[in-house]
Amino acid sequence: MKTSVLLFMLGLTFLFDGLAAINLQEGERTCYDIGELCSSDKPCCSGYYCSPRWGWCIYSTRGGR
């Protein structure tokens, strides 16, 4: 019984993971979240900016350091 439940949960995990991967490939995203690669044609979401050094979306600091 425990094995059946475990296999069922594992199957659901793989199913939803596969569906999420297909959705990401089909539709283009309008913005990118923290830690994702960005460029001029792949902008970061609100609250982040594209690091010129690394090319990743990072947190935006208002006052700077």
Curated annotation (Swiss-Prot):
Annotated keywords: Disulfide bond, Ion channel impairing toxin, Knottin, Secreted, Signal, Toxin
SUPFAM superfamilies: omega toxin-like (SSF57059)
Main location (coarse class): secreted
Span of the signal peptide: 1-21
Tissue and organ distribution: Expressed by the venom gland.
Entry-linked Pfam families: Toxin_12
Bridged cysteine pairs (disulfide): 31-45, 38-50, 44-57
Subcellular location, record wording: Secreted
GO cellular component: extracellular region
Family as reported in the entry's similarity comment: Belongs to the neurotoxin 10 (Hwtx-1) family. 31 (Jztx-15) subfamily.
Notes concerning its domains: The presence of a 'disulfide through disulfide knot' structurally defines this protein as a knottin.
Function field: Probable ion channel inhibitor.
Protein name: U12-theraphotoxin-Cg1a
Organism of derivation: Chilobrachys guangxiensis
